[in-house]
């Protein structure tokens, strides 16, 4: 009787203090299960987001001077000529300047667009898991998304290193600069739909998805099998939408050239 009473009143061991941002970054790479449990217990957003943004702008600073914007404008001019052969050289030159200017501005705003994407991802994931009986808060979901994004940070660092080594990069071929997905096996102009589809099966994207599954299971208190079903279903929907847009663009280009 006394042993039972002693056991019921035994003090619980205190939880370890939460890891800092850099410990968590290392943890999601080498010990994701325990790290995402720590993130779910005490999520953080500001420091990892700022760190990713700083790295993103360093990459942008190094990449922008190496972007071959002429290749982008030439491709657009080719499409415009096919649709409007009567356009003058002055008009085409104006389109070329606008295209290059827009590309440069968009490139500098790219890291900031990432914030919007992370917020959308966190909101969609939280809604999906709550609808399927899971738990969690928006802060937990956003923190999970940010730390799951680390493989993509590594990817952009690798892309930047390759770009610096090459000297010039065609922005329209960014997804195949690093041969981490099978899209490089097909020609983007001849098979745009297949190119778009294959580009989704990137090693770094799959790595991110695995981390998302582990992290979402931790904050939502669901099984990893259920988390995998939800995350992969949402990913499949995104692939379908992206492929549909590629198909519409390809059909539009086909109409222009016929």
Segment roles from a protein language model:
Residues 1-19:
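Low-complexity, intrinsically disordered extramembrane tails and loops of integral membrane proteins
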Residues 11-16, 102-106, 191-195:
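Short juxtamembrane and helix-loop transition motifs at transmembrane-helix boundaries
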Residues 16-27, 96, 192-193:
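Coil-to-alpha-helix initiation sites in intrinsically disordered, low-complexity, charged segments
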Residues 21, 34-156:
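Selected alpha-helical membrane-embedding segments in polytopic membrane proteins
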Residues 30, 122-126, 209-211:
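A generic alpha-helix surface/boundary motif
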Residues 139-255:
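Hydrophobic alpha-helical transmembrane segments and adjacent short intramembrane/lumenal linkers
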């Amino acid at each position: 009787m006394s042993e039972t009473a002693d056991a019921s009143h035994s003090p619980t061991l205190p939880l370890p203090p939460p890891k800092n941002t850099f410990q968590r970054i290392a943890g999601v790479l080498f010990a994701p299960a325990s790290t995402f449990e720590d993130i779910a217990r005490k999520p953080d957003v500001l420091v990892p987001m700022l760190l990713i943004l700083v790295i993103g702008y360093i990459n942008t600073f190094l990449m922008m001077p190496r972007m071959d914007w002429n290749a982008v404008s030439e491709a657009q001019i080719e499409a415009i000529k096919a649709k409007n052969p009567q356009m003058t050289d002055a008009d085409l030159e104006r389109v070329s300047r606008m295209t290059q200017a827009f590309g440069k501005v968009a490139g500098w705003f790219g890291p900031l667009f990432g914030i919007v994407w992370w917020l959308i991802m966190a909101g969609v994931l939280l809604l999906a898991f709550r609808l399927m009986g899971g738990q969690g808060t928006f802060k937990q979901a956003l923190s999970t998304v940010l730390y799951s994004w680390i493989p993509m940070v590594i990817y952009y660092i690798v892309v930047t290193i390759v770009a610096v080594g090459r000297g010039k990069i065609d922005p329209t071929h960014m997804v195949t600069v690093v041969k981490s997905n099978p899209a490089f096996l097909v020609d983007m102009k001849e098979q745009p739909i297949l190119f778009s589809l294959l580009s989704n099966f990137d090693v770094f994207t799959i790595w991110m998805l695995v981390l998302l599954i582990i992290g979402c299971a931790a904050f939502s208190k669901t099984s990893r099998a259920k988390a995998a079903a939800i995350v992969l279903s949402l990913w499949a929907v995104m692939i379908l939408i992206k492929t549909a847009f590629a198909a519409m663009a390809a059909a539009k280009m086909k109409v222009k050239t016929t």
